[in-house]
């Protein structure tokens, strides 16, 4: 099988060493495809030039190719079986025009809870959309979505053998939507230290919760990538996951990252059918489902209970399950096969 993994214009490198959910997913698919025995071409100028030593890198984007051009003919003659792309592309006319000339499948994963696809973007066979959670399946029901847990990998982020850490960790972008202040309060209730890892996206949000964020039990780490990011997760006793009431998580990378590192998770959710429910089980974490009408303090106390529950789990067992559940080879094989 010949697979093309397409980049897109953005602020992160391909592959990124840290953040960038779609970029990390595309890299995981490329890694999984090659490990599964497929031939892989990295398509687009965004892929790191250093990869040319080990990968076939072609700096071409389908949406930039003219009808009847030599570039179109060369792409068609290459004979791709599958293209893997960011979720917007099957709804972009310039991209789909070129793709239709190639006689191959396309697969993508929905990383946004709000993007509106065209009515003809997916048929469930030649063009396939994959979604992480029951919540996302319901949101995109008109496009014949297929349930699947996304795998996200970064460059040089190989996980060490699992060990039981000591401090709590929260990782992600720091803003209102991700609501780390609830994790900080839950840690405070338990008398535990918590490390906050990630870039600040909203300074006003941080100022609103300054008393919590400046408390003695909070350690600000900043944005990490590569081995340092992996170590921050692996060295924790529990990964604490939060988000705001109205926010819909399309396919959080942190579930796979934490479980693959052997760190159990304590997740706060405001409804059933979320990514946390799809990703976790009793052996890998604890999910606190809180009525969104409840106050933050109630949510923090429920989350604190979940942290204590998750802390009793076996880290080596968590890692074993995580490596299987979020295996890039399994993920690629699921996405490369048409439904029966």
What are the roles of these predicted feature ranges?
Residues 130, 146-197:
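Conserved donor-binding/catalytic core segment of Leloir-type glycosyltransferases
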Residues 234-250, 263:
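Acidic donor-binding loop of glycosyltransferase active sites
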Residues 62, 293-340:
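A charged, aromatic-enriched C-terminal amphipathic alpha-helix characteristic of glycosyltransferases
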